[in-house]
Amino acid sequence: MSPLLRSICDITEIFNQYVSHDCDGAALTKKDLKNLLEREFGAVLRRPHDPKTVDLILELLDLDSNGRVDFNEFLLFIFKVAQACYYALGQATGLDEEKRARCDGKESLLQDRRQEEDQRRFEPRDRQLEEEPGQRRRQKRQEQERELAEGEEQSEKQERLEQRDRQRRDEELWRQRQEWQEREERRAEEEQLQSCKGHETEEFPDEEQLRRRELLELRRKGREEKQQQRRERQDRVFQEEEEKEWRKRETVLRKEEEKLQEEEPQRQRELQEEEEQLRKLERQELRRERQEEEQQQQRLRREQQLRRKQEEERREQQEERREQQERREQQEERREQQLRREQEERREQQLRREQEEERREQQLRREQEEERREQQLRREQQLRREQQLRREQQLRREQQLRREQQLRREQQLRREQQLRREQQLRREQEEERHEQKHEQERREQRLKREQEERRDWLKREEETERHEQERRKQQLKRDQEEERRERWLKLEEEERREQQERREQQLRREQEERREQRLKRQEEEERLQQRLRSEQQLRREQEERREQLLKREEEKRLEQERREQRLKREQEERRDQLLKREEERRQQRLKREQEERLEQRLKREEVERLEQEERREQRLKREEPEEERRQQLLKSEEQEERRQQQLRREQQERREQRLKREEEEERLEQRLKREHEEERREQELAEEEQEQARERIKSRIPKWQWQLESEADARQSKVYSRPRKQEGQRRRQEQEEKRRRRESELQWQEEERAHRQQQEEEQRRDFTWQWQAEEKSERGRQRLSARPPLREQRERQLRAEERQQREQRFLPEEEEKEQRRRQRREREKELQFLEEEEQLQRRERAQQLQEEEDGLQEDQERRRSQEQRRDQKWRWQLEEERKRRRHTLYAKPALQEQLRKEQQLLQEEEEELQREEREKRRRQEQERQYREEEQLQQEEEQLLREEREKRRRQERERQYRKDKKLQQKEEQLLGEEPEKRRRQEREKKYREEEELQQEEEQLLREEREKRRRQEWERQYRKKDELQQEEEQLLREEREKRRLQERERQYREEEELQQEEEQLLGEERETRRRQELERQYRKEEELQQEEEQLLREEPEKRRRQERERQCREEEELQQEEEQLLREEREKRRRQELERQYREEEEVQQEEEQLLREEPEKRRRQELERQYREEEELQQEEEQLLREEQEKRRQERERQYREEEELQRQKRKQRYRDEDQRSDLKWQWEPEKENAVRDNKVYCKGRENEQFRQLEDSQLRDRQSQQDLQHLLGEQQERDREQERRRWQQRDRHFPEEEQLEREEQKEAKRRDRKSQEEKQLLREEREEKRRRQETDRKFREEEQLLQEREEQPLRRQERDRKFREEELRHQEQGRKFLEEEQRLRRQERERKFLKEEQQLRCQEREQQLRQDRDRKFREEEQQLSRQERDRKFREEEQQVRRQERERKFLEEEQQLRQERHRKFREEEQLLQEREEQQLHRQERDRKFLEEEQQLRRQERDRKFREQELRSQEPERKFLEEEQQLHRQQRQRKFLQEEQQLRRQERGQQRRQDRDRKFREEEQLRQEREEQQLSRQERDRKFRLEEQKVRRQEQERKFMEDEQQLRRQEGQQQLRQERDRKFREDEQLLQEREEQQLHRQERDRKFLEEEPQLRRQEREQQLRHDRDRKFREEEQLLQEGEEQQLRRQERDRKFREEEQQLRRQERERKFLQEEQQLRRQELERKFREEEQLRQETEQEQLRRQERYRKILEEEQLRPEREEQQLRRQERDRKFREEEQLRQEREEQQLRSQESDRKFREEEQLRQEREEQQLRPQQRDGKYRWEEEQLQLEEQEQRLRQERDRQYRAEEQFATQEKSRREEQELWQEEEQKRRQERERKLREEHIRRQQKEEQRHRQVGEIKSQEGKGHGRLLEPGTHQFASVPVRSSPLYEYIQEQRSQYRP
């Protein structure tokens, strides 16, 4: 609503609020009006700055006579008040003064404008009826004021912009000044430092020097941050400028393109070439600029590192600083020289490339004139993509800037935290000084408090640990449940699929059998219509009955299937119930174990308390021996009581366990009994239903058929001597035995677990008692040994007292350490126990799966037996029918042949079924063996792990005891502080060794898991390959048989026709045929000789020509004898040949599809092998890196003299790596050649290569395992040597303290140097990775090109092989036909004699009939003439139509020929261009390889020049190797060129032959060529789409690379930050070494817990990742299997359809032949109609075929896209895993730095922790929860990514339909919106009209009411008739108000 309407509504609402309703209507009384004025007009009345308003109000009230105010009067009153108050309202409210004080003179116009607008709004309607000129003046004035205000606003905006520009300039000047000042300050500070280097130590104390250094460091850091900010701003400006330039260039290019389009095509081509050159140059320039920027950044980073190193060295030693400065300057100069040289070399290379590109471009201009049209579209697409890339880059840059800002903020916060921490440290130092005085008095109190607090803390920690363990267990349970459910679901799905497939196969077989039977029956009925009409009726009845029987059988089968499904469901429910029960049992067991563990912990706590009390007693023995005795007594009593309690609890627990087991066993027995009863009932019901169904069938079936079936059943019962009752009993017995076995196994497992638990508890108790006894014995020895002379005794007593005082501080800490160690051991045991439980669970699952598989196999065997019985019944019935037919037909020879054929088909089907069964059995056996092997491997690995863990634990315990003994001896001999240091160092070493061992174990486990996965995948793929090959072989055999049968049938039919139609000319034909066959054989021999030379397509052409010649000769002979018959036969033959060829083409296409699928699989396998090899290489590199790190650690322990040798060795290693990389470059082209050979040559060689690769992989794995074993042994030996050294040094400790300190300093220096070297190595590794990525991309592109080149070669080879196979089949068929022809001739002669006799008899009968019918014919002649005339007319019409169609077809043929000719020419041109491009790409590739080699050689040469001359022999060796490599490459290059030339020649020959063949076959294949052309166009379009998609994929890959680079930059920043932090830490450590040495024990102890927790979490995360990865792999495999199954189903369905069509065609052909023999007179008229119908049907069928083929081709790219997306997803997933691993490593490093910092904080805040420990615990708990949340978020993100990938795959197939739907939806929405807007407008107009009408009506009504009262209220006249009384209370109130405010 508008403000005016709101104000009107407010007025009406206010009036209604104060109105009093009476009989006269709604009106205001004086009281109501008083209230209204007081409340609403109070501000005007109380502070009337303008008294006119009050006077006007009083005047209006005086005029009122009634004392009542109507609504009209109220409105007039309000409008008058508004008119009076308009100019004085601001004064009344007190707002004018504030506005005037705030606003300037410029705002006066705006206020006037607003006032006028308000006046215009609130004017009444009566004022609107004034004169029009006044309104126009006001409008003009308002418009002028608006224009002025707008101008002022614009001027203000301009002023603001100018001010902003000025501010920016001032800021820039200020920044420049600041920079200049900072530079001057730096110089001054550096000069001061250089001048005061020697005097700083004397003049200033350490604290002042540290403060100055800290301030300098802070200033330096601030400057560096500012510099970084400036650089970032410069980068932004540079990027914006680049974008502007790009936009300008794009606009210029667009304009130029528009101009070129208007000009001639030649100019367009030239300009396009120039544009391409410009773009290439620009891209090259951009790449160069980016490279230069990266180099500059690297230089800056290096310079920063060097500066930081210089500062560190200055702090340590002045002399070393000078030397290092000189060295670094030299290094910088060398690096700069190297960079300059590299830049010069790059420039030279760029110039060379430009020259070469110019040459190439000149050649391209000559060659690629026709390609440019096609490239225009591609360029436009590239421009769009580049624009998209730029936009995405902008967004990423913005994101980078935001991240950098966040990082800076975090750095600032950390700095502030550092300052605060330093202040806290100082305060703590002061507090410690004050507190040291009071510590002696409060020690005892503190000890007590600390003990109590620690107990509380331990309890809380235990509670937290319990919660965490419970959560973990719940998670494990959930994961296990999910895995089980998924496995069950998968098994069920597989079973269902198998059942569906079997059902489909059964239905198809039944359908095929039915169709064959129907066809045979129809043939027999048509042949024997005249003689066997009575038999036909009987057969029809039999067929109907059989169909009924089949239907009933189908219904029975469906019912049986439903029952089986019900049984399966019930079995599934039972399994779920069993699983639930098992889960409940496990939960109960876990609860029991938890309770036992809790009790054990309590016991341990009690034991620990007892130990503590014993220690206290020992301390107090010297002072209070009586108390000690009492305590001992109490302790002994307490121990006895506790032991009794423990025994009682154990007994109770055992009783409860027994009771629970008995209850569970009873429940299981009851459930088993119920299940037995239910199964029996179900079986009985099923048997009853089957019997009822049999009785019904018997009642319906006639007696004779029932007798046949009963006889068949009797025979089957004789053959199969296994009745159903025996089978049911056997099943029940087997099930009972299986259940008993399960129960026994469960009981045995439970007993084993209980026994293990008891053994573990006994071992723990023995260990605790042994430990206590050993401690007591050691203390007794110490007391006995400590008895020297008196002086020494006194001194030792004093020392002992001091030690006691100090030990009292550290006793609780030591106790905590011991407790934690015990907890660790307990955790390890618990983990072992959990692992054992998991193993048992796995075994149980495996057993269950095996049992289920056995059950499934048994069910399958039963079903097979049932199916076999049914098939035997059906076959037996068929055989009986055939026997009857033989008896009825008196055993005719034609029927015998048919029976033979049927028998052969049945035999083939039986053989196929047997093969399938064998294959299934083999698969099942292979799977079972594989599972058994996996189980054995797992068990062996578990045993090995357990043994290793036991050994390690024993060694650790032994070492721990030795260390304790050594510590005690050292404490007796030596002082206090050095002893503590040694202990700390030993503990630190021990922990480091433990960590190293754990890391090694983790690495070994990961490697084993990887190997297992790889082996499993390899075995699985091998099996799949073998299965596929076997299936392919079977398919090929079936197809060959079918082809042979078709050819045989076709030839038999032709021979029968010829013999029946040409009985007289058989002898002539035989002679001529023999001659022709002899000639044909001679020609075939010549052809075979030519095939050996060429082996290509001319064979088919020649054969076709010869066959055509033979057929033409035969047709000429037949024309001489029977012209009419020959014409019809020719037509039929042509049609049949055309159909046969079409079928062959369809088969060829299907075979090509089937062949392409294994090729894809082979490619995938090759890619997989390549990836595996890359992974192996990466693993080898990792091993080498680990060896290098270990060697570096060993070298750091040596002196500086050994560093030079280390450098030389490192150089040698770098050379080796370069050589390896060179070898890799050499190996990769060799591998590519091998891949080509593999693809070109036969399958045998591929299999051999695969076997060789597998053998090599196995050898490599074995060698890696041996290396790892040797490395582990070497590491153990080194550790033992180090321990011995440490022991020797500890013995000579007092003499070697100074040496140790010096060694520590040297170790620190070496650590710094090693860190620097590590950074350099990381940079080198990153460079290597980048190179590898670029190489990998280049190789992928090359592989794609090679695959494109090899596709036509493969197709040609396949066609060649297929032709050779066809020739062989033809030869075999020809020989077989010759033999069959002889037999058939003999049979035909015999038949001919019989038929002659029959003809004679028929002629006699015909003569008699003719005499009788002659009279009847004379009458019918007239009718026949009429019919003939009609037929003649119809024939004429048909002839005319045929002529028209022929002309039309000829015209279409001509057009199509022209189109095809053009299309072929274009194809040839495209092929030539592609070949040229390939040649150029190969040349470029070789040129790049040579350039890379030159670069490497130059780099090696420069590196060698710097080295000593002692390495000359190595150089010579390398040169010889390089020469050999060059020779090999040249030789390979020549071989490749020769191969390419041969391929080109072969292609040219093939093209010439294809061209001739196409010219000959144009007339025959016109219709087919149209469809082929369409398919080819679609294929091109799809190829273009694929290219576009590939480009998009490459773009995504580039984006991923950019993200990786950014992450690497962030990593470098983090590393720098960590390095700074470490430097600060070192400074703090130098100050507080004494305090740190005292407090290291507590810190280390506190560190161990979070480390263990992290390790546990990491293990859990790794397990989860592995599990998810496996699940995804399984899903992918299932998806692939589903696709393969669907493809097989589709293929089978197509084959069946083809068979049915062929059978229908053959049936129709036979029907036509029979009709011709019987009805020769009516044959002419009907044949023409049949031909037409057949042509139409064939056209429809072809259309359907081509439609299906097109659909398949459309689906192919989608499937390929899905496969590519899956591969990309897998690749991304792997890359993400690698990135995650790197991030985790970085996190660990950062966590280590943070850990050190936290440790220092803990050391500083120990005293505060005593008061704030509960808060710290809560904080730790929160921190852990946050970490868990973060991990969960990461998991969710991963899941979301996976879900997105899956969603993308799912929606990829539906994108087209969605887009179309979206467009339609958008159009509909637009229409709907338009309609809605139109309706809203109409409604708005209607409402306005209605409101206006309503207002008019109200005014009219009110005017009428005023007339009724006798008054009219008009705006200019007297509104009120008489004067009111002045004595009203309201009048007095208003006068009082007036008197108050008047002067």
Curated annotation (Swiss-Prot):
23 X 26 AA approximate tandem repeats: region residues: 1292-1894
UniProt region (S-100-like), positions on chain: 1-91
Protein residues bound to Ca(2+) 2: D62, D64, N66, R68, E73
Region feature 10 X 30 AA tandem repeats, mapped onto this chain: 906-1204
Tissue specificity comment: Found in the hard keratinizing tissues such as the inner root sheath (IRS) of hair follicles and medulla, and in the filiform papillae of dorsal tongue epithelium.
Region (8 X 6 AA tandem repeats of R-R-E-Q-Q-L): 378-425
Comp. bias regions, Basic and acidic residues: 197-209, 608-684, 724-781, 789-812, 859-872, 950-992, 1065-1085, 1092-1111, 1152-1162, 1214-1263, 1274-1371, 1492-1524, 1533-1673, 1682-1691, 1876-1912
Binding residues annotated for Ca(2+) 1, in chain numbering: D32
Keywords: Calcium, Citrullination, Keratinization, Metal-binding, Repeat
UniProt key word Metal-binding: yes
Ranges where the EF-hand domain occurs: 23-48, 49-84
CDD domains documented for this protein: S-100 (cd00213)
Description of post-translational modifications: Substrate of transglutaminase. Some 200 arginines are probably converted to citrullines by peptidylarginine deimidase.
Sequence repeat boundaries on the chain: 314-326, 327-339, 340-351, 352-364, 365-377, 378-383, 384-389, 390-395, 396-401, 402-407, 408-413, 414-419, 420-425, 906-935, 936-965, 966-995, 996-1025, 1026-1055, 1056-1085, 1086-1115, 1116-1145, 1146-1175, 1176-1204
GO terms under cellular component: cornified envelope; cytoskeleton; cytosol
Region feature Disordered, mapped onto this chain: 110-164, 186-209, 222-274, 426-485, 509-546, 608-819, 837-872, 950-1000, 1046-1120, 1137-1162, 1193-1371, 1404-1435, 1492-1691, 1757-1820, 1834-1864, 1876-1928
Function: Intermediate filament-associated protein that associates in regular arrays with keratin intermediate filaments (KIF) of the inner root sheath cells of the hair follicle and the granular layer of the epidermis. It later becomes cross-linked to KIF by isodipeptide bonds. It may serve as scaffold protein, together with involucrin, in the organization of the cell envelope or even anchor the cell envelope to the KIF network. It may be involved in its own calcium-dependent postsynthetic processing during terminal differentiation.
Entry's family note: Belongs to the S100-fused protein family.
Domain notes for this protein: Consists of nine domains. Domain 1 contains two EF-hand calcium-binding domains. Domains 2-4, 6, and 8 are almost entirely alpha-helical, configured as a series of peptide repeats of varying regularity, and are thought to form a single-stranded alpha-helical rod stabilized by ionic interactions. Domain 6 is the most regular and may bind KIF directly by ionic interactions. Domains 5 and 7 are less well organized and may induce folds in the molecule. Domain 9 contains the C-terminus, conserved among different species.
The name this protein goes by in its record: Trichohyalin
Gene it is expressed from: TCHH
